[in-house]
């Protein structure tokens, strides 16, 4: 289970540094936005709900791509929203500070979009069912999240450190994330057209501690209530093994496994004339 109070505190603290360190999250965002550009014209008068807007990176681009859209952007970290409100041309955006899993919606949306956020939900399936109900006819729920191969080098180094220290107890580092197949199953909402794709991004750092700093600066450190590593000696062993086993050409590597989901609702679209004929491409990145 994710400790939402702790997570909120960390994201509030990271609001000022998030954009500087969120390299992978921005790559994921650009992929989502490219899919919307293929589906809707610039003139489209669509209703958009953005979940987990953070510092407003996607929000600002949505305003530029779809100037006639009505946009609502939600995040549960007040400091993130404060940064988002400082972006250009977002005066007409409705910002709300709320937890996605406690969200009460009254409207219907042509687009519900979320980037690198749903891994923080404690019950993704329940949230997807609720969100799907608030899609307009032929509306789309488009989101990215992190998959199970994220930080695979870190997890391998941690397991090798446990073996070295002869630790048998079940302790982990980081949270459990979905495989592509698991996410596909979770997204299989009745009467919804579902497509899930995946890709991996490899980031490079001078030292492991630089990698950890990048995680901390985007607020993504472990907020799981399950048992996790608290042993300084085990942590030091993991750092040493990471640098020993996962250094290439003088830099350590870190894998980010990105999953992209597209769920389309059946029914007649509200404003067919303002959409492009092309559909979302169902190809892997």
UniProtKB/Swiss-Prot annotation:
Q: Which UniProt keywords apply?
A: Biotin biosynthesis, Methyltransferase, S-adenosyl-L-methionine, Transferase
- Pathway listed: Cofactor biosynthesis; biotin biosynthesis
- Record's InterPro entries? BioC, Methyltranfer_dom, SAM-dependent_MTases_sf
* Catalytic activity entry: malonyl-[ACP] + S-adenosyl-L-methionine = malonyl-[ACP] methyl ester + S-adenosyl-L-homocysteine
* CDD domains (UniProt xref): AdoMet_MTases
The answer to whether keyword Transferase applies is yes
Task: Set out the biological process GO terms recorded for this chain's protein.
Answer: biotin biosynthetic process; methylation
Q: Does the keyword Methyltransferase apply?
A: yes
Its top-level enzyme class, in one word, is transferase
Q: Please explain the role this protein plays, according to its UniProt record.
A: Converts the free carboxyl group of a malonyl-thioester to its methyl ester by transfer of a methyl group from S-adenosyl-L-methionine (SAM). It allows to synthesize pimeloyl-ACP via the fatty acid synthetic pathway.
Q: Which family does it belong to?
A: Belongs to the methyltransferase superfamily.
The name this protein goes by in its record: Malonyl-[acyl-carrier protein] O-methyltransferase
Q: Which organism is it from?
A: Bacillus cytotoxicus (strain DSM 22905 / CIP 110041 / 391-98 / NVH 391-98)
